[in-house]
Amino acid sequence: MLFREATPTDIPQIQIVRHLVKENVLSNPNLVTDQDCLEFLTIRGKGWVCECDGQIVGFAIADLKEENIWALFIDPKFEGKGIGRKLQQIMLDWYFSQDKSYVWLGTSPNTRAEQFYRKSGWIENGKNGSDEIKFEMYKDLYLKKQCC
């Protein structure tokens, strides 16, 4: 497996992975456009991918402008292999090196993602919208978890 920074040429494969997921499914696949992905990768933040045999099997994108994790998705065939954990680590290491001390994300309740974030030490802090759980991570908490 190869972990690397995402580039605009990765967007078609990123979109494929995004649409393969079984949980946190987009109600309308057209809601997240290639242009949205490009903006988040090149203007608002940065992204990373995991490749296996030349195919992208997971990706993560951080949004500096809104101080949130815009996306972290793994092809369901590759879940449980540590890809999400590694992408999260790469992303948060970079994010907190950008003079940021706080980041949040939203995810649907009763999903593998919810359990992943809880296990990773994210703190639940209310709702994001009407149905998503809002999780937060703080730089000092993250760094403490990394060293101990």
Named regions from a protein language model:
Residues 80-93, 119:
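Conserved acetyl-CoA-binding loop-helix of GNAT-fold acetyltransferases
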Residues 95-108:
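Conserved GNAT acetyl-CoA-binding A-motif
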Residues 49, 55-63, 68-73:
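Conserved beta-strand in the GNAT
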Residues 1-16:
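A short beta-loop-alpha structural element at the N-terminal edge
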Residues 38-49, 68:
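A short helix-loop-beta-strand connector motif used in the catalytic cores of GNAT acetyltransferases and
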Residues 72-80, 107:
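A short, internal acetyl-CoA/4′-phosphopantetheine-binding micro-motif in the GNAT/acyltransferase core
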Residues 85, 109-126, 133:
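Conserved active-site alpha-helix within GNAT-family acetyltransferase domains
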Residues 15-42:
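Conserved GNAT-fold acetyl-CoA-binding loop/helix
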